[in-house]
Each structure stands twice: as C-alpha cells, then as structure tokens.
Regions:
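Carboxylate-rich, polar loop motifs that coordinate divalent cations or form catalytic acidic clusters
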Residues: 3-7, 12, 23-341
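Hydrophobic membrane-targeting alpha-helices
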Residues: 16-21
Length: 341
C-alpha cells in the first residue's frame, strides 16, 4: 500500500513539474495558432480599353458578353470587340441614338437589343432596325433598360415600361395608370419566365407575375428617403437604379445601398457594415442566389455570400488594386496583374 501511494505521489510531482516546465519554456518553442487564410476570391488579369485603342468613347454605360464577343454601349456609339479588333456602330448605321444606355441578348437568334437616348435598336446579322415613339408603340425614346425573355422584349423608359411581343409585333404599355408605380422613371428591368422586375426611380421595385398578370410594388417601408430606420425591414431606398433576378432571388441596387430579397426576407448592404466601397451603386448583377457584382462610384465589388472583394484603380498610377474583406471584417490587400492598354 505504501509503495502504491508513493508511486501515485511521484507521478503527481512529475506532472506538476512538466506543467511548470511548459509554462516556463520560451515562447518560440510553443506552436503559434495560424492566421486565418485569406478567402479565395476571383482574381483577374485586367486589360483596359479606351479611345486610344478602339473604343468610340471612354464613357461606358453598358457591357454585354456574348461568347467570345463583347458589346459595349458608350456615349458615342455601340462597339463590338471580336477577334482582338473593335467595330463601331453609329447613327449612320441605323442606331437610334449615339448614346447607348443598355444592352440585352436574344439568345435564340443572337440578336442584340440596345436601349439608347433616342429609341430602341435591334442589331441582327449586321442589320440595325430602330424603334421610336414615332414608328412604334415605345412609350418613350429614352430607354434605360432592356431585357429579353422568350418572345418578349421588356423595356424600361423615362415614361414607364413597355413590352414588345416579337411574335405578334404588339406593344403593351405600363405606367401609373395600370401599375402601382407613382413615378414613371424606369431605370432597369430583369425578365425571367416567372417574374419581371423593374427598377423605378422614386417608386422602388415593381414586380410582374407572368402567370397571373399581377403587379406588386416594393418600396422603403419606413418612408424615409435618406435614413433607414430598421436595416432589414424592406427595400433599402425608393430610388432604385437596377434590378437582377436570378435563382428566385431579387438583387436591387440604389444610390443609398443595396438589397437582396428571397421572397420573404430582405437583407440590405451598406458600406458601413459590408464590403461595399460605396453606397452609391449604379448596377447590380446577380450570379446566383448567393453571389453578386456591384458597380459603384468608388469601385467594383463582388460578394460571394460571406466575403467581399473590391477592385479599384490605384490613385497613384491607375493600375488595378484588389482588397478582400472576410466575414470578421478584416480587410487584406491582394496582388492582381494588368496588361498594357
């Protein structure tokens, strides 16, 4: 019994000594916790295009990617980049107006629809046909947004929205008389087989149900045009600049932040509590239900559902810069590369 007791006491002394030795050991001998890894976010090789190498104007309103072709709407014409060369379409080619504000692709035929400051144009196999208030049912010649779904072309104009049935050629007009909008300045449109959404300046977001023909409106529920009383109570602001509907998720950009809506709950994004470089957002493009791109006046932002990446030009030399913001709010610069313009 004495031997067993002595053995237990001796083992206890060794254990205490081991703990004391570990506590007194140099810090260099103790494994340090690894720093959290930087989230994997899209990294790009940037190549810039200006009037010096083919663009008709440096003021770009819209970009459309069609396979290996890139269409660019500028303040002075429509540009097509294909096979490392630019081709420019102007009013001399039949374009409705030199300022091209929006672009959409009709995938079945490959036709490109261009919304301009002077009407709506269709580019088909090199031929351009234009629609205006004078020769069609277009509600206004200032076309801010266009979206093609099925056999319908949906258009957002400065005087409401309209739809062109490509099969019958019939136009339908939508404004304050037959929809819930009380402002008719439609900035953007996103059409799918089930729902069509319009971004309306001062009237929030309009939703059209393709099956029932019902219209609904989403706006800032607290009625404050500048202050969001409760962050996720609804659409962040009534001045909506664009909408993107994908995977049953609505993304909406405004000049005061951005919103995501899943049909039941809203989630809003502000510069102060997200990775947005600015609340002033001109365009949002949803990748899917979790990911989206945001075009702001302070840079391009990408959200993967948790983390953020921001792409901006350097103030020193104009070269691209990238930062990543993780879920904990830590911001880390990331190296990116560029190609000569």
């Amino acid at each position: 019994m004495k031997k067993l007791l002595c053995r237990v006491l001796w083992m206890s002394v060794l254990a205490v000594a081991a703990v004391q030795f570990a506590a007194a050991a140099p810090a260099s001998n103790i494994a340090k916790p690894k720093a959290p890894a930087i989230p994997e976010m899209p990294r790009f090789r940037f190549e810039n295009f200006t009037t010096a190498n083919g663009l008709p104007n440096n003021h770009v309103f819209a970009v459309l990617v069609d396979g290996n072709r890139i269409w660019v709407g500028t303040e002075n014409g429509l540009a097509l980049y294909e096979n490392h060369a630019w081709k420019v379409f102007t009013t001399a080619d039949g374009l409705a107006h030199r300022a091209v504000l929006s672009l959409a692709l009709y995938k079945r035929t490959g036709d490109v629809w261009a919304g301009t400051m002077g009407g709506l144009s269709r580019i088909s196999a090199g031929r351009i046909d234009s629609y205006t208030q004078l020769n069609s049912g277009l509600s206004n010649d200032v076309v801010y947004g266009v979206s093609v779904e099925g056999e319908n072309v949906w258009v957002a104009t400065a005087a409401g929205a309209c739809r062109l049935d490509l099969h019958t050629g019939q136009w339908s007009l939508y404004n304050e008389r037959n929809t819930p909008m009380f402002e008719i300045w439609a900035y953007g449109v996103s059409a799918t087989p089930t729902k069509v959404y319009f971004a309306v300046w001062g009237s929030g977001v309009l939703e059209y149900d393709q099956k029932t023909g019902r219209w609904d409106r989403y706006d800032d529920p607290d009625g404050e045009n500048e202050v969001v009383v409760m962050k996720d109570q609804g659409l962040i602001h009534e001045i909506v600049s664009s909408v993107s509907y994908v995977d049953n998720i609505l993304w909406a950009s405004t000049y005061f932040g951005n919103s995501r809506y899943d049909g039941r709950y809203w989630h809003n994004f502000l510069k102060k509590d997200s990775g947005l470089p600015s609340n002033f957002t001109n365009q949002v493009k949803g990748v899917d239900g979790k990911r989206a791109w945001f075009s702001t006046d302070k840079g391009l932002a990408y959200y993967d559902g948790v983390n953020w990446a921001v792409y901006t030009p350097s103030l020193k030399d104009g070269k691209p810069e990238m930062t990543v913001r993780d879920a904990q709010g830590k911001v880390t610069p990331v190296a990116v590369s560029s190609a000569p313009a």
